[in-house]
UniProtKB/Swiss-Prot annotation:
Belongs to the asaB hydroxylase/desaturase family. Residues 1-25 are annotated as: Disordered. It is an enzyme of class 1 (oxidoreductase). Induction: Expression is positively regulated by the oxaleimides biosynthesis cluster-specific transcription factor poxB. GO terms for molecular function: oxidoreductase activity. Hydroxylase/desaturase; part of the gene cluster that mediates the biosynthesis of oxaleimides, cytotoxic compounds containing an unusual disubstituted succinimide moiety. The first step of the pathway is provided by the HR-PKS poxF that serves in a new mode of collaborative biosynthesis with the PKS-NRPS poxE, by providing the olefin containing amino acid substrate via the synthesis of an ACP-bound dec-4-enoate. Its EC number is 1.-.-.-. InterPro entries: AsaB-like. The keyword Oxidoreductase applies. It comes from Penicillium oxalicum (strain 114-2 / CGMCC 5302). This is Hydroxylase/desaturase poxK. Pathway: Secondary metabolite biosynthesis. Keywords: Oxidoreductase.
Length: 325
């Protein structure tokens, strides 16, 4: 399926029109939004790409800012890893295609040209990964013109919980292959990279999973497809997902707490990427060396961003990753 042809943003040209200093670097203390608490039986919800019932708001989630020190990984990129932090930095990605080879406004072009390189990069980065299945991608931009991309997500979140990860495996891998793959190690990993780096505006902050406690993550609901309804069933595993069917899944909304460590990579470029692990089944095993297995994350506004800095334009590719270990 090819999206309607629309102009590709020429955001990089902004930096060519004026003289800019290098992107901000170093640790920074800045506000990050966290969802407010809900008292049971109430819970947070949001409708994504499908309308809510008449009279129901798209979301009831409200953010509250907390001052967070975000540590810069530049120069110490190897200090984080997936097993401890659910975060890994990839560099030297010269084989991952970019514009003009990829038309970012064409779903078909992204799937045909970009997806295989992402799959190869993840297999290379994650030991033992034998199968990588991409189930979605999202492009974000700090301006919604000339293309109506979504803006950066400016509230801390975790895209799927453990039960949602199981449903994703069954939903996308089918009723035969899905249960078999669930017998091994299964993960959800985001591949995040800029499309116009280096990033000046709204970088991504990721909390080390080893420092975020389970009881500091609230469970909310995403309504993802079909006819909206607050009583629609949780995600039903199906062999061939139908975009018109009703579907929802749990996602996580963290609270900020002392002891959490947050990271970003200053000035991340187009030959770099972040692997942000959303779920790792090995974290559920007794005596596992995987600490938490899920990285909450959020974009944030850096007060050091210079005037006239280029907009952020980025892609996040959501992957199911399977290994036998």
């Amino acid at each position: 399926m090819t999206a309607t042809a629309t102009p590709v943003p020429t955001v990089a040209s902004h930096a060519q029109d004026i003289t800019l200093p290098p992107p901000p670097k170093g640790d920074i203390t800045t506000p990050i939004l966290f969802a407010q608490d809900f008292q049971k039986p109430s819970t947070g919800y949001m409708f994504i790409k499908n309308p809510p019932p008449a009279g129901v708001p798209y979301t009831n989630i409200r953010g509250e800012p907390a001052m967070v020190t975000v540590e810069d990984l530049r120069g110490k990129e190897n200090s984080v890893n997936l097993d401890r932090d659910s975060l890994q930095v990839l560099q030297g990605l010269t084989d991952v295609p970019r514009s003009p080879e990829v038309n970012w406004n064409s779903v078909e072009s992204v799937e045909k040209t970009f997806y295989p390189a992402v799959e190869a990069a993840i297999k290379s980065a994650i030991p033992g990964a034998h199968t990588v299945h991409i189930f979605r991608h999202g492009i974000r931009h700090t301006q919604n013109w000339p293309v109506p991309y979504n803006p950066p997500a400016m509230i801390a979140h975790l895209d799927q919980t453990g039960p949602a990860a199981i449903n994703r495996v069954l939903r996308h891998m089918g009723p035969v292959e899905g249960p078999r793959l669930l017998q091994g190690r299964y993960r959800i990993v985001h591949f995040w990279t800029p499309l116009n780096g280096p990033v000046y505006t709204c970088p991504v902050a990721v909390a080390s999973s080893a420092t975020v406690k389970d009881n500091d993550i609230q469970i909310f609901v995403s309504h993802l497809g079909g006819i909206g309804g607050l009583d629609m069933p949780l995600g039903r595993p199906v062999a061939k997902p139908d975009a018109s069917e009703q579907y929802r899944e749990d996602f996580g909304a963290p609270r900020y707490a002392d002891g959490q460590r947050w990271f970003y990579l200053s000035g991340i470029t187009q030959d770099e990427a972040l692997l942000i692990q959303i779920f790792d089944s090995n974290a559920l095993q007794k005596d596992s060396t995987v600490q938490g297995g899920r990285a909450v994350h959020s974009a944030f506004r850096d007060p050091r961003t210079p005037q006239g800095a280029p907009d952020r334009w980025s892609i996040e590719v959501s992957c199911l990753v399977f290994s036998d270990e």
